[in-house]
């Protein structure tokens, strides 16, 4: 709950200053980690860094919702998601490379420099987008609307299904006797497919509409994740194809899921829209924790080749909530506010 709390505390600042402040604090946390020589110091540094990481993504998403042109809103969200995806895919191997050449703590100093640079660019290039001061009680308003908290579940379950597989993908590939070189190449294809998927998801939502796009992408995600479990017993090429498919369709859901949060906030909690968007973004992080936990249970009790089926079940739950919960509520709400033709 760090991101919603900090968002309320800094809501009196304009969005440019909010983003610059959180980036600076994120950089300072990594500087502290670099110079830390105790477990307590490292723990404090990582705690601050974790808080700021969530807030940065939330602020970027809110800016997209409030200030991007309506026709380009999905693409703006896709670009934010691409930054997040690229950082995940490139950051780990880059950090390993830097730590091997310059020492274990050097990646933290590199991250601090990049974060300070981003903060400076924010101050000198971003307009002063105004922000409405928020209150802690506004966070509770979001949970009073069933479609809104159903949206939280869709976000957590959909994104969680990706991480059931993602966290233990290397274990699966090693069990299937892939060499380290082949695993590295598969991860490269995984990253490329994820990046293309993010762009595709945003474009599809613009062309076909939010609900049609998200329903299609979740369906394809379920099929791709389920195929991963069956591919364990088939050829290696089939497994590689299923990994690429799950990467593409799993990450393609990001932009439509973010759009879903904004749409539900605007429709059901218009007076506390920013707070609802914040909580919707937090649901994605909860999904990461949920997916990692479910994936670990699957590996321990069933075997890593069952992770795909477990992930598909989470995505199926998200699709059912979207279809039989949120869509009905949204259509009912729209029919009430629609003008009469009689």
Identify the residue ranges that each predicted region occupies.
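Paired small-residue
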Residues: 29-32, 40-49, 237-245
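Extracytoplasmic gate region of multi-pass secondary transporters
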Residues: 148-198
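Intracellular juxtamembrane helix-capping segments at the cytosolic ends
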Residues: 55-68, 252-268
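Helix-breaking motifs and short loop linkers at transmembrane-helix boundaries and internal kinks
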Residues: 14, 35-41, 52, 231-233
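Conserved MFS/SLC helix-loop-helix module at the cytosolic interface between two early adjacent transmembrane helices
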Residues: 1-37
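C-terminal transmembrane helical hairpin of 12-TM major facilitator-type secondary transporters
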Residues: 212-257
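Cytoplasmic helix-loop-helix junction between adjacent transmembrane helices
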Residues: 39, 45-83
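A late C-terminal transmembrane helix in Major Facilitator Superfamily
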Residues: 264-301
């Amino acid at each position: 709950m760090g991101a919603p709390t900090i968002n309320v505390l800094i809501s009196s600042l304009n969005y440019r200053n909010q983003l610059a402040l959180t980036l600076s604090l994120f950089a300072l946390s990594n500087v502290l980690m670099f110079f830390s020589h105790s477990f307590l110091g490292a723990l404090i540094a990582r705690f601050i860094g974790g808080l700021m990481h969530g807030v940065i993504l939330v602020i970027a998403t809110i800016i997209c919702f409030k200030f991007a042109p309506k026709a380009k809103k999905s693409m703006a969200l896709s670009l934010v998601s691409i930054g997040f995806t690229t950082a995940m895919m490139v950051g780990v191997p880059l950090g390993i490379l830097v730590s091997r050449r310059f020492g274990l703590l050097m990646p933290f100093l590199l991250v601090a420099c990049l974060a300070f640079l981003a903060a400076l660019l924010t101050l000198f290039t971003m307009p002063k987008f105004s922000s409405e001061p928020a209150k802690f009680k506004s966070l509770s308003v979001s949970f009073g609307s069933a479609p809104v908290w159903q949206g939280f579940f869709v976000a957590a379950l959909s994104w969680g299904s990706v991480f059931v597989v993602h966290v233990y993908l290397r274990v699966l590939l090693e069990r299937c006797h892939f060499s380290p070189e082949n695993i590295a190449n598969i991860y490269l294809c995984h990253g490329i497919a994820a990046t293309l998927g993010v762009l595709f998801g945003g474009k599809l939502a613009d062309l076909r509409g939010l609900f049609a796009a998200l329903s299609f992408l979740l369906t394809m995600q379920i099929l791709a994740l389920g195929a991963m479990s069956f591919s364990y017993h088939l050829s290696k090429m089939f497994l590689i194809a299923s990994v690429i498919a799950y990467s593409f369709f799993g990450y393609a859901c990001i932009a439509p899921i973010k759009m879903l949060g904004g749409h539900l906030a605007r429709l059901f909690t218009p007076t506390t829209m920013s707070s609802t968007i914040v909580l919707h973004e937090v649901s994605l992080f909860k999904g990461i924790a949920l997916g990692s936990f479910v994936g670990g249970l699957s590996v321990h009790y069933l075997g890593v080749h069952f992770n795909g089926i477990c992930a598909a079940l989470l995505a199926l739950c998200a699709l059912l909530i979207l279809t039989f919960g949120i869509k009905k509520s949204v259509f009912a709400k729209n029919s009430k506010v629609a003008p009469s033709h009689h």
